[in-house]
Amino acid sequence: MQRTLVVYNIYVARDENSKKAYLLEEDFTNFLTDLSKQSIVDRKKNCAQEHKILYLDSFEHQKEEHILNVRMRSARYASRRNVIDTETMKSRGILKRENDGDEETNHLGLKFIDEENILVLFESNYYGIGFGRIVHYWESF
């Protein structure tokens, strides 16, 4: 399966109330820690219009390097197709239930560069979930 790496450079909006990127690193790590303590059902979000669910699978914080590695999972459901045995060409029928999903994984690497810049390396794939959906997922908690 083809995967594409996309780079985002996020600039922290600066005003007298803005946090520095390193403080954002600590806050975001704490957020992911709290989120990962929830049951998988509680941290799952449904993207009904796309027939997908999305959830935080895991993350790793490399504190000395100011790097967060995040693994998100998604699953597309409501897609039920007839399955055939490609050797015998006999139909095996529909093997999935309506709620069964095809699981995909997206990885993100976040590097907190300095007080104002966060570099994000996002692994994109056609069947996975987009970066905007992941940001929306985080904002929903």
Labelled PLM ranges:
Residues K111-E123:
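Glycine-rich, often proline-containing surface loops adjacent to acidic residues and nearby aromatics
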Residues Y77-S79, E115, Y127-I129:
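A short acidic, glycine/proline-enriched capping/turn motif at secondary-structure boundaries
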Residues M1-G109, S124:
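Intrinsically disordered, low-complexity polar/charged tails and linkers
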